[in-house]
Structures are given as structure tokens and as C-alpha cells.
């Protein structure tokens, strides 16, 4: 009887620990998939609004990218300006 109790209790713990481990893997994968910070789209929109004060441009003419190189983060801003 003790062997059956041991197997039953072990199976329940194993199922819970497997589910927990799978969830941790999914969360870690989701975090790794985020290539840009949450504030980047808002930053891009604000930059478009500021640039529009001086130059007539569309939103798709401004691209913002954030690149991590070691301990440094590089913010790259590309603006397609209209011909004069």
C-alpha cells in the first residue's frame, strides 16, 4: 500500500512541477521575443509630431530602432525628408 501512495503523490507533484516549468519557459520565451521596449511606439509618435512642426512628413517616414550592444543601447532614428 505504501508503494501506491508514493506513486500517486509523486505523480501529482510531477504534473504540477512540469506545468510550472512549461509556464516559466513560455514566459521566458515571450520576454525574449520582445525586441523593443514598450515606450518605443510612443516615442516614435512624439518625434513625428515634433518634426511635423518644421517639415511636412508622414508617420511612415520616421523609423525608430533600439539596438543593444553589450552594455550600451543605441537609439537609431531614420527620417525620410521630402524634396525641397
From Swiss-Prot:
Source domain of life: Bacteria
Alphabetical list of InterPro entries matching this protein: MinE (IPR005527), MinE_sf (IPR036707)
Any Pfam family hit: MinE
Keyword Cell cycle attributed: yes
GO BP terms: cell division; regulation of division septum assembly
Entry keywords, A to Z: Cell cycle, Cell division
Family as reported in the entry's similarity comment: Belongs to the MinE family.
Protein role: Prevents the cell division inhibition by proteins MinC and MinD at internal division sites while permitting inhibition at polar sites. This ensures cell division at the proper site by restricting the formation of a division septum at the midpoint of the long axis of the cell.
Protein name: Cell division topological specificity factor
Gene name of this polypeptide: minE
